[in-house]
Amino acid sequence: AAWLHDIASITDYSLYVLHHIHGAEMAYGILKEYGYDNKKIRLVQECIKNHRGSVNLEKNSLEELCVADADAISHFDSVPSLLYLAYVQKGMGIEDGKEFVKNKLARSFQKLSTESKQHYQNKYEKVMEVLN
């Protein structure tokens, strides 16, 4: 699930808005091709469907929670990529780009489980301090 959770948006950006749904469908074909049984495929599909932080879906397993948290946590280690997205790909000005990245990180932090928020609080605060 961790490897496949963003596959739809990576292979076709037009699928981004519903990439959690399309990705789960794509994962079925990939995993079936590699001989995974249907039970494991369904578990992976649920992780992919429920990883999307901007779509507030209940996490029904520890695996779903882990994939969703890891997806959000990854943003704190990819600030340069987020800045590139804002300034180069989206063509934003200095302040707008900075606010875009800060808002993305704030949303990501709010999506974390309670345990992950406690663990990543300091890192989140340090990254936000640099951006301020």
Where are these regions (language model features)?
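Amphipathic alpha-helical segments within well-ordered protein domains
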Residues: 8, 24, 28-32, 106
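An amphipathic alpha-helix signature
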Residues: 20-28, 45, 98, 102
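Short helix-to-loop capping/linker segments positioned immediately adjacent to catalytic or ligand/cofactor-binding
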Residues: 31-38, 54-58
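Short, well-structured alpha-helical segments
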Residues: 38-49, 124, 128
